[in-house]
Design a protein with these regions (language model features):
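Classical Sec-dependent N-terminal signal peptides that target proteins to the secretory pathway
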Residues: 1-19
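SH3-family beta-barrel domains
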Residues: 15-35, 45-50, 57-99, 103-124, ...
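Second-shell loop/turn segments in exported
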Residues: 37-41
Length: 146
């Protein structure tokens, strides 16, 4: 047991840190998800949604292993990923509010699967925008945030 602890202490920080999962978004509206971490692997899925959030699970050179909100997984080249924040509404008929409280004015009802861009988050709420609306959603209704 002490040997394991000693070995763990000598692992480089980057190796330990690289095991953390985090979210990025698709940079373009045409992105290939591949079966493995190189251009030689076949394409599994062809994404057509810019800013779609993906969970980064692993890395290999210039490729990142991702999982999307439908549990599809595979590899995407880093040039196709962005740090811009976005999320997917995971429940149906979610109310977009004018402020970060359920007692504020309702602005719109968003359907499951709707892509929203994230402006900022605080506590259990995120300020988001779509093409038509700006407002606040509860974090628990969104996929793409940690």
């Amino acid at each position: 047991m002490p040997l394991i602890i000693i070995l763990f202490l000598f692992l480089p920080y980057e190796i330990l840190h690289s095991m953390d999962e985090y979210f990025l978004t698709l940079r373009n509206d045409k992105v290939n998800l591949r079966q493995g971490p190189s251009f030689n692997y076949p394409i599994k899925i062809f994404y057509k949604k810019k800013f779609l959030p993906v969970l980064i699970q692993d890395k290999s050179n210039n490729f990142r292993k991702i999982r999307d909100h439908e549990n599809n997984s595979g590899w995407i080249h880093i040039s196709q990923l962005s740090k811009k924040k976005a999320a997917i509404v995971i429940n149906d008929n979610i109310i977009l509010f004018s402020n970060s409280t359920i007692y504020s004015n309702p602005l719109a009802i968003l359907k499951k699967g709707r892509l929203v861009k994230i402006n900022k988050c605080k506590d259990k709420w995120c300020k988001v925008h779509t093409e038509e609306f700006k407002g606040w959603l509860q974090k628990e209704s969104l996929w793409g945030l940690l």
